[in-house]
Design a protein with these regions (language model features):
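C-terminal transmembrane bundle of multi-pass solute transporters/carriers
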Residues: 50, 59-63, 71, 75-78, ...
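Structural signature of transmembrane alpha-helices in multi-pass secondary transporters
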Residues: 21-22, 54, 113, 144-152, ...
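Short helix-loop-helix connector
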Residues: 6, 24, 40, 69, ...
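Helix-loop boundary and gating motifs at the non-cytosolic
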Residues: 1-56, 213, 217-264
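Residues that mark transmembrane-helix kinks and helix-interface sites
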Residues: 30, 118-126, 131, 240, ...
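Hydrophobic alpha-helical transmembrane segments
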Residues: 103-110, 114, 139-195, 256, ...
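Hydrophobic core of transmembrane alpha-helices in multi-pass small-molecule transporters
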Residues: 19, 101-119, 230, 310-325
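Flexible cytoplasmic inter-helical loops of multi-pass small-molecule transporters
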Residues: 136, 187-213
Length: 401
């Protein structure tokens, strides 16, 4: 990150808040499924339902929050989302100690945290272009995504370790604490959160339609959202099968499972560093395609693993490195070509269309694992991931400099 951004106290506060929020989210990604599997004895199908419930708010609320961000103060929505997640996750250990924790309760928690996460993510993506100059977007995104990578290192490891020490329901309180830190940091940002648009507010439907039309009509945005949809559907299926593969097929303890998943983080941190320089050197299109081929191809190796934790860590590291490169490069493309007044709606549209199939993917992953076993489910999901680089290859985006 440039010295100018480090000297910007408000950016640093955003960075701290985003990092804490990501730590909470990453820890929760481990603790919620493992509460279902280890404490409540959830089946493969029930785990798929849990992940689908957590991701369903993307379909239900992403476009609404996108329009809201462009009309309201983005940072106000971020702190509300942090507060909501802190309260909801903090209720898990209370329910456990009272003896009322069950799968229906966990489904409600997953759905409510999912709503808050959608709100935070849309507002966060729209807040950076309001806080820094356009020529600082690449450096700002690199710093923020680097912190997300650090969260991917620490979050699963912390979550998995605490599950071993405290049991999964009690460990959920850690995610709640991270969201409290994020809430306090973002609240301290002093720069006025100026509304991104001066146009007449109109109706939400009209504003949502403007975001959809821009994405549909812009070649680069349209290509990114198609590739993202294919990727996210397949990745959701893969992660549902992967959690079952690690916990039941390989029978890894919680701490080891957290360590394996945490390997995504250092790879993603390296990917953040690469994405700050390589696209300018080789061109955005070429970097996106090569990185997508390497990252998605690496996941094809998962079904062949039988006992090597080191090999699992290596696969996750490679995937983390190159998938992060793809994510950051496509994010810079999106933020650069999108007018400031449409940042929230375009971010929400991309999330809605790109992540909207993840609930279905989670259900498919659980069904495949239940009927064909986790190894076959992993193979089919990994093959689905490879459709993403094929989409980039067949589009004009491959020539983008």
């Amino acid at each position: 990150m440039s010295a100018t951004l480090w000297a910007d106290r408000d950016f640093v506060r955003l960075w701290i808040g985003q990092t804490s929020s990501q730590l909470g989210a990453q820890a929760s990604q481990v603790t919620l499924p493992l509460i279902a599997v280890t404490t409540l004895g959830a089946s493969a199908g029930q785990l798929g339902v849990l992940r689908a419930v957590q991701q369903a708010p993307i379909l239900l609320f992403a476009l609404y929050f996108g329009a809201l961000v462009d009309r309201w103060r983005a940072r106000h929505l971020m702190v509300l989302a942090d507060f909501g997640r802190a309260v909801v996750l903090g209720a898990i250990p209370i329910a456990y100690l009272l003896g009322v924790l069950g799968l229906p309760w966990l489904y409600v928690v997953a759905f409510l945290t999912g709503i808050c996460t959608v709100c935070f993510d849309v507002a966060y993506q729209a807040s950076l272009p309001r806080l820094v100059a356009r020529d600082q977007l690449a450096a700002g995104n690199s710093a923020l995504e680097g912190s997300r990578s650090a969260a991917q290192i620490c979050g699963p490891a912390v979550g998995g370790g605490l599950i071993s020490l405290l049991t999964a329901p009690i460990a959920a309180v850690v995610g709640s604490a991270f969201f409290v830190v994020s809430f306090l940091s973002i609240r301290r940002i002093q720069r006025p959160d100026v509304l991104a648009t001066t146009e007449s507010p109109g109706g939400l439907v009209r504003q949502i339609r403007a975001g959809l039309l821009l994405v549909a009509g812009h070649t680069s945005l349209r290509t990114i959202v198609i590739a993202s949809s294919l990727y996210q559907f397949s990745f959701a299926a893969l992660m549902t099968a992967y959690l079952l593969f690690l916990s039941r097929t390989l029978e890894l303890p919680g701490a080891t499972l957290g360590l394996v998943l945490a390997a995504f983080g250092p790879g993603a941190l390296l990917g953040s560093l690469l994405s700050a320089s390589q696209p300018r050197r080789f061109g955005y299109g070429r970097v996106v395609i090569v990185a997508a081929l390497v990252s998605d191809g690496a996941m094809l190796c998962l079904p062949a693993v039988h006992s090597s934790v080191v090999l699992l860590i290596a696969i996750n590291f490679v995937f983390g490195t190159f998938s992060q490169t793809v994510d950051l490069a496509t994010m810079v493309i999106r933020q650069t070509v999108t007018p400031l007044g449409l940042q929230g709606r375009v971010a929400a549209t991309m999330n809605f269309l790109g992540l909207g199939l993840t609930p279905v993917g989670s259900l498919v992953g659980g069904a495949l694992a239940a009927h064909f076993g986790t190894r076959t489910a992993l193979l089919l999901a990994a093959l689905g991931l490879c459709l993403s680089p094929v989409t980039f290859l067949l589009s004009p985006l491959r020539k983008l400099r």
